[in-house]
Amino acid sequence: MSLVEVRVEIPSAEAEAVNELLLEQELAAWSVFEDVVVGRAWLIGLFPDQTAARDAAAALRPLLPLAAQAEPGYREMAESEWRDSYKTHFHPWQFGRLHWVPVWQRETYVLPAGHHALWLDPGLAFGTGNHETTRLCVERLVALADEFGTAGLVVDAGCGSGILALSAAKLGFRDVVGFDNDLEAVRVSEENAVLNELNGQVRFFVGDLVSGLKDVQAQVLMANILADVLIRYASHLVQAVRPGGVLILSGILATEVAQVRAAFGQEAPDWAIESKTMGDWSDLELRRPAGVLEL
């Protein structure tokens, strides 16, 4: 198997803005790489063939800041080469009893008793899970799994490549769904479920923050989406959490968290709210008071 790499050099000053764009547009096949020593940055994507690579580059270009619209370079990479390129910067990481491990370590990685691994393959547009927005969510999720056990519905709203929903299943939650308004994201999520032998255990479907949350009463609802989208759909997100349930919001720049907190405080004034910050990003955890389920 071979892949086509697309590489665009971007100004290092634009790296954070481009990374935010990738998250907002859910462009899982692309990543931003920075060399802070030399002050250079690149936007890199991997695609199955030249046609897909050129189409993706053409679609992305008008979305980029003008300063980041350099001409892309294309090169075909053998399977061994593109896997090795990821091995240099992608290493296992862990929080609590869940480990996120590159699939090429599947035969050698040693898990402690009672721990679980989610196998990641960046070549499948899975990403590494290492971005602060994802890590904030999964750290909350691990803690909630210890608190709630396996009871209740877990929903990953805007699932992207499925890492949060699949992490929930690995932690033992039995009723897990994920949705995205991008058909390609749903397809990738389903592929990643197969990679982790979770196909049939997690249901993925195409939906948005209105249709995907219709009639939902989640024990845990996760939305790793940018701040403006969270604010716009605050009422839908709040209404989809059952009494005693938890809403986890991420994808929020630290400079925007007060604005998001205020918006959700208006929608859910009696909910307990707390926040954590990691790097330039913050999350919010909102807990709905236990009470009678609204019909």
Curated annotation (Swiss-Prot):
It comes from Opitutus terrae (strain DSM 11246 / JCM 15787 / PB90-1). One of its GO terms (biological process) is methylation. Its EC number is 2.1.1.-. GO terms for molecular function: protein-lysine N-methyltransferase activity. It comes from the Bacteria. It catalyses: L-lysyl-[protein] + 3 S-adenosyl-L-methionine = N(6),N(6),N(6)-trimethyl-L-lysyl-[protein] + 3 S-adenosyl-L-homocysteine + 3 H(+). It is an enzyme of class 2 (transferase). Pfam families: PrmA (PF06325). One of its GO terms (cellular component) is cytoplasm. Belongs to the methyltransferase superfamily. PrmA family. S-adenosyl-L-methionine binds at residues 134, 158, 180, 224. Methylates ribosomal protein L11. This is Ribosomal protein L11 methyltransferase. Keywords: Cytoplasm, Methyltransferase, S-adenosyl-L-methionine, Transferase. It is found in: Cytoplasm. InterPro entries: Ribosomal_L11_MeTrfase_PrmA, Ribosomal_PrmA_MeTrfase, SAM-dependent_MTases_sf. Disulfide bonds: none annotated.
